[in-house]
Regions:
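Short, solvent-exposed loop/turn and secondary-structure capping segments
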Residues: 114-115, 223-227, 265, 271-275, ...
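Short coil/linker segments at helix-helix boundaries
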Residues: 217-255, 313-319, 337-353
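Solenoid-like repeat scaffolds
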Residues: 410-416
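Beta-strand-rich recognition/accessory modules
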Residues: 1-21, 584
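Aromatic (Trp/Tyr) and acidic
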Residues: 34, 42-112, 137-209, 213, ...
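Internal metal/ion-chelating core segments
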Residues: 322, 332-336, 341, 348-385, ...
Protein backbone atom coordinates (compact mmCIF):
# COMPACT_ATOMS: atom_id res chain seq x y z
CA UNK A 1 0.00 0.00 0.00
CA UNK A 2 1.11 3.57 -0.59
CA UNK A 3 2.01 5.37 2.65
CA UNK A 4 -0.47 7.95 3.96
CA UNK A 5 0.34 11.58 4.62
CA UNK A 6 3.20 11.82 2.13
CA UNK A 7 3.69 14.47 -0.54
CA UNK A 8 6.15 14.70 -3.38
CA UNK A 9 7.60 11.55 -4.89
CA UNK A 10 5.87 8.62 -3.23
CA UNK A 11 6.33 5.88 -5.80
CA UNK A 12 8.49 5.47 -8.88
CA UNK A 13 7.84 2.97 -11.66
CA UNK A 14 10.58 1.65 -13.90
CA UNK A 15 9.28 0.23 -17.17
CA UNK A 16 11.52 -1.93 -19.34
CA UNK A 17 10.05 -2.55 -22.80
CA UNK A 18 10.54 -6.03 -24.18
CA UNK A 19 11.28 -5.41 -27.83
CA UNK A 20 12.77 -7.32 -30.72
CA UNK A 21 15.31 -5.36 -32.77
CA UNK A 22 14.29 -5.09 -36.39
CA UNK A 23 10.84 -6.61 -35.83
CA UNK A 24 8.28 -5.77 -38.50
CA UNK A 25 4.55 -6.25 -38.20
CA UNK A 26 3.15 -8.51 -40.90
CA UNK A 27 1.02 -6.78 -43.55
CA UNK A 28 -2.75 -6.75 -43.15
CA UNK A 29 -4.95 -6.82 -46.26
CA UNK A 30 -8.16 -5.07 -45.24
CA UNK A 31 -11.13 -6.07 -47.38
CA UNK A 32 -14.73 -7.20 -47.12
CA UNK A 33 -14.88 -10.70 -45.63
CA UNK A 34 -18.30 -11.11 -47.19
CA UNK A 35 -17.26 -10.06 -50.68
CA UNK A 36 -18.49 -7.72 -53.38
CA UNK A 37 -21.21 -7.33 -55.97
CA UNK A 38 -19.88 -7.72 -59.52
CA UNK A 39 -20.48 -4.11 -60.51
CA UNK A 40 -19.35 -2.59 -57.24
CA UNK A 41 -16.17 -0.68 -56.48
CA UNK A 42 -13.64 -3.14 -55.04
CA UNK A 43 -10.65 -1.75 -53.17
CA UNK A 44 -8.40 -3.62 -50.75
CA UNK A 45 -6.20 -1.62 -48.40
CA UNK A 46 -2.81 -2.99 -47.40
CA UNK A 47 -1.66 -1.89 -43.95
CA UNK A 48 2.12 -1.88 -43.47
CA UNK A 49 4.56 -1.26 -40.65
CA UNK A 50 6.05 2.19 -41.28
CA UNK A 51 9.51 0.62 -41.11
CA UNK A 52 8.64 -1.92 -43.77
CA UNK A 53 10.58 -0.79 -46.85
CA UNK A 54 9.97 -3.90 -48.91
CA UNK A 55 7.75 -3.77 -51.95
CA UNK A 56 5.69 -6.58 -53.35
CA UNK A 57 3.00 -6.79 -56.00
CA UNK A 58 -0.58 -7.24 -54.85
CA UNK A 59 -2.38 -10.19 -56.38
CA UNK A 60 -5.98 -11.27 -56.75
CA UNK A 61 -6.42 -15.04 -56.92
CA UNK A 62 -9.45 -16.92 -58.18
CA UNK A 63 -10.22 -20.17 -56.34
CA UNK A 64 -11.33 -23.06 -58.50
CA UNK A 65 -13.83 -25.76 -57.64
CA UNK A 66 -10.94 -28.09 -56.82
CA UNK A 67 -9.28 -25.56 -54.50
CA UNK A 68 -6.60 -24.55 -56.99
CA UNK A 69 -5.80 -20.86 -57.43
CA UNK A 70 -5.32 -18.80 -60.56
CA UNK A 71 -3.89 -15.29 -60.57
CA UNK A 72 -6.37 -12.98 -62.27
CA UNK A 73 -4.78 -9.65 -61.42
CA UNK A 74 -1.28 -8.57 -60.42
CA UNK A 75 -0.43 -4.93 -59.90
CA UNK A 76 1.79 -2.72 -57.78
CA UNK A 77 -0.23 -1.50 -54.82
CA UNK A 78 -0.83 2.24 -55.06
CA UNK A 79 0.50 4.17 -52.08
CA UNK A 80 -2.26 6.00 -50.19
CA UNK A 81 -0.06 7.50 -47.48
CA UNK A 82 0.34 7.33 -43.71
CA UNK A 83 -2.56 7.15 -41.27
CA UNK A 84 -2.25 6.67 -37.53
CA UNK A 85 0.87 4.52 -37.03
CA UNK A 86 0.85 2.61 -40.32
CA UNK A 87 1.49 3.15 -44.00
CA UNK A 88 -1.18 2.21 -46.50
CA UNK A 89 -1.29 1.00 -50.07
CA UNK A 90 -4.33 0.03 -52.09
CA UNK A 91 -5.29 -2.40 -54.82
CA UNK A 92 -8.30 -1.50 -56.94
CA UNK A 93 -9.78 -4.60 -58.57
CA UNK A 94 -13.12 -3.10 -59.56
CA UNK A 95 -12.58 -4.32 -63.12
CA UNK A 96 -12.90 -7.94 -61.96
CA UNK A 97 -16.60 -8.73 -62.29
CA UNK A 98 -16.77 -12.47 -62.85
CA UNK A 99 -18.70 -14.19 -60.04
CA UNK A 100 -16.67 -16.66 -58.03
CA UNK A 101 -14.47 -17.23 -55.03
CA UNK A 102 -11.35 -15.08 -54.59
CA UNK A 103 -8.42 -14.35 -52.28
CA UNK A 104 -6.00 -11.43 -52.04
CA UNK A 105 -2.25 -11.77 -51.57
CA UNK A 106 0.58 -9.39 -50.70
CA UNK A 107 3.99 -10.90 -50.07
CA UNK A 108 3.52 -13.82 -47.66
CA UNK A 109 0.10 -12.57 -46.51
CA UNK A 110 -2.95 -14.21 -48.04
CA UNK A 111 -6.55 -13.49 -47.08
CA UNK A 112 -9.37 -15.91 -46.43
CA UNK A 113 -11.65 -16.52 -49.44
CA UNK A 114 -14.47 -14.12 -50.27
CA UNK A 115 -17.12 -14.03 -52.98
CA UNK A 116 -17.92 -11.83 -55.93
CA UNK A 117 -21.62 -12.47 -56.52
CA UNK A 118 -24.90 -10.77 -57.30
CA UNK A 119 -26.43 -11.99 -54.05
CA UNK A 120 -23.46 -11.28 -51.81
CA UNK A 121 -25.52 -9.28 -49.28
CA UNK A 122 -28.75 -11.25 -49.63
CA UNK A 123 -28.45 -13.28 -46.44
CA UNK A 124 -26.01 -11.11 -44.51
CA UNK A 125 -28.71 -10.10 -42.04
CA UNK A 126 -30.00 -13.62 -41.34
CA UNK A 127 -27.77 -14.40 -38.30
CA UNK A 128 -28.79 -11.14 -36.64
CA UNK A 129 -32.51 -11.84 -36.95
CA UNK A 130 -32.28 -15.63 -36.60
CA UNK A 131 -30.00 -15.81 -33.55
CA UNK A 132 -28.83 -12.51 -32.08
CA UNK A 133 -32.23 -10.92 -31.47
CA UNK A 134 -33.90 -14.08 -30.16
CA UNK A 135 -31.04 -14.55 -27.69
CA UNK A 136 -31.44 -10.91 -26.59
CA UNK A 137 -35.15 -11.33 -25.78
CA UNK A 138 -35.78 -10.50 -22.13
CA UNK A 139 -38.65 -12.06 -20.16
CA UNK A 140 -38.52 -15.20 -22.33
CA UNK A 141 -37.11 -18.72 -22.11
CA UNK A 142 -34.90 -18.96 -25.21
CA UNK A 143 -34.04 -22.38 -26.60
CA UNK A 144 -32.02 -23.50 -29.63
CA UNK A 145 -32.22 -27.22 -30.28
CA UNK A 146 -30.59 -28.92 -27.31
CA UNK A 147 -29.20 -25.65 -25.98
CA UNK A 148 -30.96 -23.30 -23.59
CA UNK A 149 -29.53 -19.82 -24.14
CA UNK A 150 -31.26 -18.51 -21.04
CA UNK A 151 -34.34 -19.03 -18.91
CA UNK A 152 -37.31 -16.70 -18.42
CA UNK A 153 -35.39 -13.82 -16.88
CA UNK A 154 -36.52 -11.03 -14.57
CA UNK A 155 -39.98 -12.33 -13.72
CA UNK A 156 -39.73 -10.11 -10.62
CA UNK A 157 -39.39 -6.78 -12.48
CA UNK A 158 -39.34 -4.18 -11.09
CA UNK A 159 -38.92 -2.09 -7.93
CA UNK A 160 -39.18 1.68 -7.85
CA UNK A 161 -35.67 3.16 -7.75
CA UNK A 162 -34.71 5.31 -4.73
CA UNK A 163 -34.84 9.11 -4.91
CA UNK A 164 -31.83 11.33 -5.64
CA UNK A 165 -29.74 8.33 -6.50
CA UNK A 166 -26.94 8.11 -9.06
CA UNK A 167 -26.65 4.48 -10.08
CA UNK A 168 -24.35 2.30 -12.16
CA UNK A 169 -24.33 2.15 -15.97
CA UNK A 170 -25.41 5.80 -16.37
CA UNK A 171 -28.78 5.45 -14.65
CA UNK A 172 -30.05 7.93 -12.06
CA UNK A 173 -33.28 8.77 -10.24
CA UNK A 174 -34.20 12.40 -9.64
CA UNK A 175 -35.88 14.03 -6.63
CA UNK A 176 -39.31 12.58 -7.49
CA UNK A 177 -40.52 9.20 -8.69
CA UNK A 178 -43.21 10.71 -10.93
CA UNK A 179 -45.20 7.55 -10.19
CA UNK A 180 -47.63 6.46 -7.48
CA UNK A 181 -45.04 4.05 -6.11
CA UNK A 182 -42.71 4.58 -3.18
CA UNK A 183 -38.98 3.83 -3.45
CA UNK A 184 -38.48 0.09 -3.18
CA UNK A 185 -42.11 -0.71 -3.96
CA UNK A 186 -42.93 -3.22 -6.68
CA UNK A 187 -44.23 -1.71 -9.94
CA UNK A 188 -46.42 -4.37 -11.58
CA UNK A 189 -46.65 -5.02 -15.29
CA UNK A 190 -43.06 -4.43 -16.40
CA UNK A 191 -41.97 -8.07 -16.72
CA UNK A 192 -42.83 -8.35 -20.40
CA UNK A 193 -41.10 -7.80 -23.73
CA UNK A 194 -37.91 -5.92 -24.46
CA UNK A 195 -34.34 -6.97 -25.15
CA UNK A 196 -31.15 -7.08 -23.13
CA UNK A 197 -29.55 -3.79 -24.11
CA UNK A 198 -26.06 -5.09 -24.76
CA UNK A 199 -23.60 -7.55 -23.30
CA UNK A 200 -25.25 -6.93 -19.95
CA UNK A 201 -28.91 -7.39 -19.11
CA UNK A 202 -30.59 -4.02 -18.55
CA UNK A 203 -33.58 -2.74 -20.49
CA UNK A 204 -32.49 0.70 -21.71
CA UNK A 205 -35.60 2.38 -23.08
CA UNK A 206 -33.71 4.55 -25.54
CA UNK A 207 -32.24 1.42 -27.13
CA UNK A 208 -35.64 -0.29 -27.18
CA UNK A 209 -37.32 2.43 -29.20
CA UNK A 210 -34.36 2.85 -31.53
CA UNK A 211 -34.52 -0.86 -32.36
CA UNK A 212 -38.29 -0.87 -32.89
CA UNK A 213 -38.08 2.05 -35.31
CA UNK A 214 -35.18 0.51 -37.24
CA UNK A 215 -36.96 -2.84 -37.56
CA UNK A 216 -40.11 -1.06 -38.73
CA UNK A 217 -38.08 0.78 -41.38
CA UNK A 218 -36.75 -2.55 -42.63
CA UNK A 219 -40.23 -4.05 -42.70
CA UNK A 220 -41.78 -1.14 -44.56
CA UNK A 221 -39.02 -0.86 -47.15
CA UNK A 222 -38.43 -4.55 -47.89
CA UNK A 223 -41.06 -6.72 -46.15
CA UNK A 224 -38.74 -9.63 -45.26
CA UNK A 225 -41.03 -12.55 -44.47
CA UNK A 226 -38.26 -14.83 -43.17
CA UNK A 227 -39.64 -17.20 -40.53
CA UNK A 228 -37.17 -19.32 -38.57
CA UNK A 229 -38.17 -18.51 -34.98
CA UNK A 230 -41.20 -19.52 -32.93
CA UNK A 231 -42.27 -17.03 -30.26
CA UNK A 232 -45.00 -17.89 -27.75
CA UNK A 233 -45.64 -14.98 -25.38
CA UNK A 234 -48.28 -16.88 -23.44
CA UNK A 235 -45.73 -19.56 -22.53
CA UNK A 236 -42.93 -16.96 -22.51
CA UNK A 237 -40.87 -19.21 -24.75
CA UNK A 238 -38.75 -18.63 -27.88
CA UNK A 239 -37.53 -21.48 -30.09
CA UNK A 240 -34.68 -20.64 -32.46
CA UNK A 241 -34.75 -22.37 -35.88
CA UNK A 242 -38.40 -23.38 -35.47
CA UNK A 243 -40.79 -21.60 -37.89
CA UNK A 244 -44.23 -20.67 -36.59
CA UNK A 245 -45.92 -19.02 -39.56
CA UNK A 246 -45.26 -15.39 -38.55
CA UNK A 247 -42.43 -13.27 -40.01
CA UNK A 248 -39.66 -13.06 -37.45
CA UNK A 249 -39.19 -9.34 -37.99
CA UNK A 250 -42.79 -8.67 -36.97
CA UNK A 251 -42.31 -10.81 -33.87
CA UNK A 252 -39.31 -8.76 -32.81
CA UNK A 253 -41.21 -5.52 -33.45
CA UNK A 254 -44.00 -6.86 -31.25
CA UNK A 255 -41.58 -7.86 -28.48
CA UNK A 256 -40.10 -4.37 -28.25
CA UNK A 257 -43.52 -2.76 -28.48
CA UNK A 258 -44.79 -4.83 -25.55
CA UNK A 259 -42.15 -3.36 -23.25
CA UNK A 260 -42.77 0.22 -24.36
CA UNK A 261 -46.53 -0.20 -23.90
CA UNK A 262 -45.96 -1.79 -20.49
CA UNK A 263 -44.09 1.27 -19.27
CA UNK A 264 -46.95 3.63 -20.14
CA UNK A 265 -49.49 1.23 -18.67
CA UNK A 266 -47.49 0.89 -15.45
CA UNK A 267 -46.57 4.50 -14.67
CA UNK A 268 -48.10 6.67 -17.39
CA UNK A 269 -44.88 7.68 -19.10
CA UNK A 270 -41.68 6.28 -20.56
CA UNK A 271 -39.03 5.34 -18.03
CA UNK A 272 -35.25 5.44 -18.33
CA UNK A 273 -35.00 1.70 -18.06
CA UNK A 274 -34.81 -1.29 -15.76
CA UNK A 275 -31.42 -2.27 -14.35
CA UNK A 276 -29.94 -4.45 -11.63
CA UNK A 277 -29.77 -2.96 -8.12
CA UNK A 278 -26.07 -3.51 -7.41
CA UNK A 279 -22.66 -4.10 -8.91
CA UNK A 280 -22.69 -7.80 -7.99
CA UNK A 281 -25.60 -8.34 -10.36
CA UNK A 282 -24.17 -5.91 -12.92
CA UNK A 283 -21.11 -8.13 -13.34
CA UNK A 284 -23.20 -11.31 -13.51
CA UNK A 285 -21.90 -13.83 -16.04
CA UNK A 286 -24.16 -16.61 -17.20
CA UNK A 287 -27.86 -17.28 -17.64
CA UNK A 288 -29.83 -14.06 -17.13
CA UNK A 289 -32.58 -15.96 -15.34
CA UNK A 290 -30.15 -16.76 -12.51
CA UNK A 291 -29.49 -13.09 -11.73
CA UNK A 292 -32.61 -12.90 -9.58
CA UNK A 293 -34.87 -15.43 -7.90
CA UNK A 294 -37.76 -14.43 -10.16
CA UNK A 295 -39.97 -13.73 -7.14
CA UNK A 296 -41.37 -10.30 -6.28
CA UNK A 297 -39.66 -8.86 -3.23
CA UNK A 298 -41.69 -8.68 -0.03
CA UNK A 299 -39.97 -6.61 2.68
CA UNK A 300 -42.04 -8.38 5.34
CA UNK A 301 -40.13 -11.59 4.67
CA UNK A 302 -36.65 -12.40 5.94
CA UNK A 303 -33.68 -12.51 3.60
CA UNK A 304 -33.86 -15.80 1.72
CA UNK A 305 -37.40 -16.55 2.87
CA UNK A 306 -39.98 -17.40 0.20
CA UNK A 307 -43.73 -17.53 0.72
CA UNK A 308 -46.75 -17.31 -1.56
CA UNK A 309 -44.66 -16.64 -4.65
CA UNK A 310 -42.78 -13.77 -3.01
CA UNK A 311 -39.29 -13.46 -1.62
CA UNK A 312 -37.42 -11.66 1.12
CA UNK A 313 -34.39 -11.30 -1.15
CA UNK A 314 -34.21 -7.76 -2.59
CA UNK A 315 -32.63 -8.80 -5.89
CA UNK A 316 -35.39 -7.42 -8.15
CA UNK A 317 -34.25 -4.94 -10.78
CA UNK A 318 -34.93 -1.24 -10.28
CA UNK A 319 -37.05 0.95 -12.56
CA UNK A 320 -35.74 4.50 -13.01
CA UNK A 321 -38.79 6.65 -13.57
CA UNK A 322 -38.10 10.40 -13.35
CA UNK A 323 -40.06 11.94 -16.22
CA UNK A 324 -38.18 13.06 -19.31
CA UNK A 325 -40.15 14.41 -22.25
CA UNK A 326 -37.39 13.30 -24.61
CA UNK A 327 -38.02 9.68 -23.62
CA UNK A 328 -41.75 10.11 -24.04
CA UNK A 329 -41.31 11.45 -27.56
CA UNK A 330 -38.78 8.77 -28.51
CA UNK A 331 -41.04 6.03 -27.23
CA UNK A 332 -44.20 7.30 -28.92
CA UNK A 333 -42.29 7.62 -32.19
CA UNK A 334 -41.59 3.89 -31.95
CA UNK A 335 -45.17 3.09 -30.92
CA UNK A 336 -46.62 5.08 -33.82
CA UNK A 337 -44.26 3.30 -36.22
CA UNK A 338 -44.96 -0.13 -34.74
CA UNK A 339 -48.70 0.39 -35.09
CA UNK A 340 -48.29 0.47 -38.87
CA UNK A 341 -46.35 -2.80 -38.99
CA UNK A 342 -48.50 -4.68 -36.49
CA UNK A 343 -51.86 -3.82 -38.03
CA UNK A 344 -52.37 -7.33 -39.40
CA UNK A 345 -50.18 -9.40 -37.07
CA UNK A 346 -51.63 -7.96 -33.85
CA UNK A 347 -54.35 -5.36 -34.52
CA UNK A 348 -55.21 -4.95 -30.84
CA UNK A 349 -51.61 -4.11 -29.91
CA UNK A 350 -51.38 -1.82 -32.94
CA UNK A 351 -54.42 0.14 -31.77
CA UNK A 352 -53.08 0.33 -28.23
CA UNK A 353 -49.68 1.56 -29.42
CA UNK A 354 -51.17 4.27 -31.62
CA UNK A 355 -53.60 5.28 -28.88
CA UNK A 356 -50.73 5.79 -26.44
CA UNK A 357 -48.72 7.69 -29.04
CA UNK A 358 -51.48 10.17 -29.90
CA UNK A 359 -52.49 10.62 -26.25
CA UNK A 360 -48.97 11.24 -24.97
CA UNK A 361 -48.25 13.65 -27.83
CA UNK A 362 -51.34 15.65 -26.89
CA UNK A 363 -50.42 15.61 -23.20
CA UNK A 364 -46.89 16.83 -23.90
CA UNK A 365 -48.31 19.89 -25.67
CA UNK A 366 -50.15 20.97 -22.50
CA UNK A 367 -47.15 21.65 -20.28
CA UNK A 368 -43.52 22.69 -20.29
CA UNK A 369 -41.26 19.77 -21.17
CA UNK A 370 -39.77 17.62 -18.44
CA UNK A 371 -36.07 18.18 -18.90
CA UNK A 372 -34.48 15.67 -16.54
CA UNK A 373 -31.22 14.40 -18.04
CA UNK A 374 -28.56 11.98 -16.91
CA UNK A 375 -25.95 9.95 -18.77
CA UNK A 376 -27.23 8.38 -21.95
CA UNK A 377 -30.45 6.92 -20.56
CA UNK A 378 -32.87 9.86 -20.70
CA UNK A 379 -33.32 10.32 -24.44
CA UNK A 380 -31.65 12.31 -27.16
CA UNK A 381 -31.96 16.07 -27.75
CA UNK A 382 -35.53 17.08 -26.95
CA UNK A 383 -36.34 18.75 -30.25
CA UNK A 384 -34.91 15.80 -32.19
CA UNK A 385 -37.01 13.29 -30.27
CA UNK A 386 -40.08 15.51 -30.72
CA UNK A 387 -39.38 15.76 -34.45
CA UNK A 388 -39.11 11.98 -34.71
CA UNK A 389 -42.45 11.57 -32.94
CA UNK A 390 -44.10 14.12 -35.22
CA UNK A 391 -42.74 12.37 -38.32
CA UNK A 392 -43.90 8.91 -37.24
CA UNK A 393 -47.33 10.17 -36.17
CA UNK A 394 -47.67 11.97 -39.49
CA UNK A 395 -46.72 8.82 -41.40
CA UNK A 396 -49.24 6.79 -39.42
CA UNK A 397 -52.22 9.15 -39.18
CA UNK A 398 -51.74 11.71 -41.99
CA UNK A 399 -53.06 14.26 -39.49
CA UNK A 400 -52.03 17.77 -40.64
CA UNK A 401 -51.22 18.93 -37.10
CA UNK A 402 -48.19 16.65 -37.15
CA UNK A 403 -47.12 18.11 -40.50
CA UNK A 404 -47.31 21.53 -38.87
CA UNK A 405 -45.04 20.29 -36.08
CA UNK A 406 -42.58 18.81 -38.58
CA UNK A 407 -42.38 22.11 -40.45
CA UNK A 408 -41.99 24.12 -37.24
CA UNK A 409 -39.17 21.91 -36.00
CA UNK A 410 -37.31 21.72 -39.32
CA UNK A 411 -35.03 24.78 -38.74
CA UNK A 412 -33.65 23.15 -35.59
CA UNK A 413 -33.24 19.84 -37.42
CA UNK A 414 -31.35 21.53 -40.23
CA UNK A 415 -28.75 22.71 -37.71
CA UNK A 416 -28.15 19.08 -36.67
CA UNK A 417 -28.89 17.54 -40.03
CA UNK A 418 -26.61 14.51 -39.69
CA UNK A 419 -28.42 13.42 -36.55
CA UNK A 420 -31.94 13.94 -37.91
CA UNK A 421 -31.77 13.51 -41.66
CA UNK A 422 -33.40 10.07 -41.94
CA UNK A 423 -36.46 11.34 -40.10
CA UNK A 424 -36.46 14.48 -42.22
CA UNK A 425 -36.30 12.47 -45.44
CA UNK A 426 -39.03 10.08 -44.28
CA UNK A 427 -41.45 13.00 -44.03
CA UNK A 428 -40.87 14.22 -47.61
CA UNK A 429 -43.77 12.31 -49.27
CA UNK A 430 -46.24 13.79 -46.77
CA UNK A 431 -45.01 17.39 -46.82
CA UNK A 432 -45.36 20.23 -49.36
CA UNK A 433 -42.83 20.42 -52.19
CA UNK A 434 -41.31 23.44 -50.50
CA UNK A 435 -40.22 21.22 -47.60
CA UNK A 436 -38.09 19.06 -49.89
CA UNK A 437 -36.70 22.07 -51.70
CA UNK A 438 -35.79 23.69 -48.40
CA UNK A 439 -33.77 20.61 -47.48
CA UNK A 440 -31.48 20.75 -50.51
CA UNK A 441 -28.85 23.13 -49.04
CA UNK A 442 -28.46 20.84 -46.02
CA UNK A 443 -28.20 17.80 -48.30
CA UNK A 444 -25.49 19.47 -50.37
CA UNK A 445 -23.55 20.46 -47.26
CA UNK A 446 -23.83 16.94 -45.86
CA UNK A 447 -22.69 15.39 -49.14
CA UNK A 448 -19.67 17.70 -49.21
CA UNK A 449 -18.81 16.80 -45.62
CA UNK A 450 -19.03 13.12 -46.55
CA UNK A 451 -16.48 13.63 -49.33
CA UNK A 452 -14.15 15.43 -46.93
CA UNK A 453 -14.48 12.71 -44.29
CA UNK A 454 -13.80 10.01 -46.88
CA UNK A 455 -10.46 11.61 -47.72
CA UNK A 456 -9.27 11.65 -44.11
CA UNK A 457 -8.29 7.98 -44.02
CA UNK A 458 -7.80 5.15 -46.54
CA UNK A 459 -11.11 3.50 -45.62
CA UNK A 460 -13.38 6.33 -46.68
CA UNK A 461 -15.55 6.48 -43.54
CA UNK A 462 -15.55 8.59 -40.37
CA UNK A 463 -13.38 6.78 -37.81
CA UNK A 464 -14.09 7.90 -34.26
CA UNK A 465 -11.41 8.31 -31.59
CA UNK A 466 -13.38 8.17 -28.32
CA UNK A 467 -13.63 5.47 -25.69
CA UNK A 468 -16.32 3.57 -27.59
CA UNK A 469 -15.27 2.39 -31.04
CA UNK A 470 -17.14 3.56 -34.09
CA UNK A 471 -19.09 0.78 -35.81
CA UNK A 472 -22.36 2.46 -34.84
CA UNK A 473 -21.21 5.78 -36.29
CA UNK A 474 -20.18 4.05 -39.51
CA UNK A 475 -23.49 2.19 -39.88
CA UNK A 476 -25.47 5.35 -39.15
CA UNK A 477 -23.44 7.24 -41.75
CA UNK A 478 -24.07 4.52 -44.33
CA UNK A 479 -27.81 4.56 -43.63
CA UNK A 480 -27.80 8.35 -43.85
CA UNK A 481 -26.13 8.12 -47.25
CA UNK A 482 -28.65 5.51 -48.39
CA UNK A 483 -31.60 7.68 -47.37
CA UNK A 484 -30.18 10.70 -49.15
CA UNK A 485 -29.17 8.70 -52.22
CA UNK A 486 -32.73 7.42 -52.62
CA UNK A 487 -34.26 10.88 -52.09
CA UNK A 488 -31.59 13.03 -53.77
CA UNK A 489 -29.64 10.74 -56.14
CA UNK A 490 -28.28 13.69 -58.10
CA UNK A 491 -26.59 15.01 -54.94
CA UNK A 492 -25.64 11.97 -52.85
CA UNK A 493 -23.96 9.02 -54.59
CA UNK A 494 -24.23 5.44 -53.34
CA UNK A 495 -20.50 4.94 -52.69
CA UNK A 496 -20.62 5.96 -48.99
CA UNK A 497 -23.17 3.22 -48.34
CA UNK A 498 -20.84 0.56 -49.74
CA UNK A 499 -17.83 1.96 -47.88
CA UNK A 500 -19.72 1.83 -44.60
CA UNK A 501 -20.80 -1.78 -45.04
CA UNK A 502 -17.33 -2.84 -46.18
CA UNK A 503 -15.79 -1.22 -43.09
CA UNK A 504 -18.01 -3.37 -40.85
CA UNK A 505 -17.10 -6.44 -42.87
CA UNK A 506 -13.32 -6.13 -42.66
CA UNK A 507 -12.10 -3.08 -44.59
CA UNK A 508 -10.79 -1.19 -41.55
CA UNK A 509 -7.54 -0.52 -39.66
CA UNK A 510 -5.82 -3.04 -37.43
CA UNK A 511 -7.09 -6.30 -38.93
CA UNK A 512 -9.36 -7.64 -41.66
CA UNK A 513 -11.93 -9.28 -39.37
CA UNK A 514 -15.67 -8.77 -39.83
CA UNK A 515 -17.26 -6.98 -36.89
CA UNK A 516 -20.54 -8.84 -37.44
CA UNK A 517 -20.19 -12.23 -35.77
CA UNK A 518 -20.90 -15.08 -38.15
CA UNK A 519 -21.00 -12.85 -41.23
CA UNK A 520 -18.03 -13.12 -43.56
CA UNK A 521 -15.32 -15.75 -43.77
CA UNK A 522 -13.47 -14.45 -40.70
CA UNK A 523 -15.59 -12.66 -38.11
CA UNK A 524 -15.66 -11.80 -34.42
CA UNK A 525 -15.52 -15.00 -32.38
CA UNK A 526 -14.71 -13.50 -28.99
CA UNK A 527 -17.11 -10.74 -27.99
CA UNK A 528 -18.78 -9.03 -25.04
CA UNK A 529 -22.17 -10.67 -25.28
CA UNK A 530 -24.16 -12.24 -22.48
CA UNK A 531 -22.04 -15.37 -23.06
CA UNK A 532 -18.76 -13.47 -22.73
CA UNK A 533 -17.61 -15.71 -19.88
CA UNK A 534 -17.22 -18.46 -22.48
CA UNK A 535 -14.90 -16.28 -24.62
CA UNK A 536 -17.37 -16.87 -27.42
CA UNK A 537 -19.84 -15.01 -29.63
CA UNK A 538 -23.49 -14.73 -30.63
CA UNK A 539 -24.09 -14.99 -34.36
CA UNK A 540 -25.28 -11.74 -35.87
CA UNK A 541 -24.11 -9.48 -33.07
CA UNK A 542 -22.27 -6.30 -34.08
CA UNK A 543 -19.31 -5.09 -32.00
CA UNK A 544 -18.05 -1.49 -31.71
CA UNK A 545 -14.91 -2.50 -33.60
CA UNK A 546 -11.68 -0.54 -33.95
CA UNK A 547 -10.80 1.56 -30.90
CA UNK A 548 -8.06 4.13 -31.46
CA UNK A 549 -5.84 3.82 -28.38
CA UNK A 550 -4.13 7.15 -27.86
CA UNK A 551 -2.28 8.37 -29.67
CA UNK A 552 -2.42 6.23 -32.78
CA UNK A 553 -2.98 2.49 -32.21
CA UNK A 554 -6.02 0.86 -33.87
CA UNK A 555 -7.06 -1.99 -31.59
CA UNK A 556 -9.69 -4.71 -31.48
CA UNK A 557 -8.97 -7.60 -29.15
CA UNK A 558 -9.96 -11.05 -30.34
CA UNK A 559 -8.39 -12.64 -27.26
CA UNK A 560 -10.23 -10.76 -24.49
CA UNK A 561 -13.97 -10.09 -24.74
CA UNK A 562 -14.24 -7.76 -21.75
CA UNK A 563 -13.06 -4.60 -23.52
CA UNK A 564 -16.61 -3.33 -23.94
CA UNK A 565 -15.55 -0.33 -26.02
CA UNK A 566 -14.26 -2.73 -28.67
CA UNK A 567 -16.30 -5.89 -28.26
CA UNK A 568 -19.72 -5.27 -26.70
CA UNK A 569 -22.78 -6.15 -28.72
CA UNK A 570 -25.56 -3.55 -28.53
CA UNK A 571 -29.05 -4.01 -29.93
CA UNK A 572 -29.37 -0.76 -31.95
CA UNK A 573 -26.37 -1.72 -34.06
CA UNK A 574 -27.91 -5.15 -34.66
CA UNK A 575 -31.11 -3.60 -35.96
CA UNK A 576 -29.20 -1.10 -38.09
CA UNK A 577 -27.13 -3.92 -39.57
CA UNK A 578 -30.30 -5.70 -40.70
CA UNK A 579 -31.38 -2.45 -42.33
CA UNK A 580 -27.99 -1.78 -43.93
CA UNK A 581 -27.65 -5.31 -45.34
CA UNK A 582 -31.03 -4.88 -47.05
CA UNK A 583 -29.95 -1.49 -48.38
CA UNK A 584 -26.74 -2.95 -49.77
CA UNK A 585 -28.54 -5.72 -51.61
CA UNK A 586 -30.98 -3.15 -52.97
CA UNK A 587 -28.11 -1.05 -54.32
CA UNK A 588 -26.44 -4.16 -55.73
CA UNK A 589 -29.48 -4.49 -57.98
CA UNK A 590 -30.94 -7.68 -56.58
CA UNK A 591 -33.87 -7.97 -54.17
CA UNK A 592 -32.82 -8.98 -50.64
CA UNK A 593 -33.49 -12.56 -49.63
CA UNK A 594 -36.80 -12.90 -47.82
Amino acid sequence: LLPAGRIGTVLEWEVQPNSVPGWLRAPVIAHSQLGYAPGARKVATIELDRNDRTTAPARLLRVGADGSTTTVKTAPATRWGDYLRYSYHQLDFSDVRQPGLYMLEYGATRTAPFRIADDVYAGAWHPTLDVYFPVAMDHMYVNEGYRVWHGDAHRDDARQAPLNHEHIDLYAQGPTTDTKYKPGEHIPGLAVGGWFDAGDFDIRTQSQYQVVRSLVDTWEKWRPTRDTTAVDWTRRRTEIHVPDGTPDLLQQIRHGTLQLVAQFDAVGHAIHGIVEPDVAQYTHLGDASTKTDGLIHDPALKLGEERGGRSGTPDDRWAFTTKASALNYGSIAALAAASRSLGEADPALARTALGIATRIWAEEQTHAPDLYQHGNTTGGPLDSERFAAAVELLRTTRDPRYATAVQALWPAMERRFAFNLRDAVAAIPLMPQSYREGMIPAVRAYAAATVKAAAANPFGVPITTGGWAGSGTVIAGALNAYALHKAFPDIMPADPVFRGAEFLLGHHPGSDISFVSGVGTRSKEVAYGNNRADFSFIAGGVVPGVLIVKPDFPENHEDWPFFWGENEYVIPEGAMWIELAHAMQDLAGKPPAK
